[in-house]
Amino acid sequence: MKILLLTLVVVTIVCLDLAYTRTCYRTHPYKPETCPPGQNLCYKKSWCDAFCSSRGKVIELGCTAKCPTVKHGKDINCCATDNCNTVANWKSR
């Protein structure tokens, strides 16, 4: 009986853990969305384009399975909590 109860507890914990999904902000539209299975990190990528001096940096937000490789001229931040990739002063459009 104890073994059966222990087995049920373990199965319950595993099932609850597998069902969890991360939520991250996405760029278009700027709102939190549930990430696809296996993508448990949020990222914020920013860089300058031709309009950087007038509009500021281009910002891309989303979910990822692993943090993208940093490329020259791009800033990348990854985090592992829900909605951790926010951008200050952005409003939903």
UniProtKB/Swiss-Prot annotation:
Disulfide feature: 24-42, 35-63, 48-52, 67-78, 79-84
Tissue/organ expression: Expressed by the venom gland.
Molecular function GO labels: acetylcholine receptor inhibitor activity; ion channel regulator activity; toxin activity
InterPro entries hit by this protein: Snake_3FTx, Snake_toxin-like_sf, Snake_toxin_con_site, Toxin_cobra-type
Highest taxon of the lineage: Eukaryota
Gene3D superfamilies: CD59
Cited CDD domains: TFP_snake_toxin
Signal peptide per UniProt: 1-21
CC annotations in GO: extracellular region
Keywords annotated in UniProt: Acetylcholine receptor inhibiting toxin, Disulfide bond, Ion channel impairing toxin, Neurotoxin, Postsynaptic neurotoxin, Secreted, Signal, Toxin
Keyword flag Transport: no
Pfam families: Toxin_cobra-type
Subcellular location: Secreted
Recorded family membership: Belongs to the three-finger toxin family. Long-chain subfamily. Type II alpha-neurotoxin sub-subfamily.
Main function: Binds with high affinity to muscular (alpha-1/CHRNA1) and neuronal (alpha-7/CHRNA7) nicotinic acetylcholine receptor (nAChR) and inhibits acetylcholine from binding to the receptor, thereby impairing neuromuscular and neuronal transmission.
Name under which the protein is recorded: Long neurotoxin 2
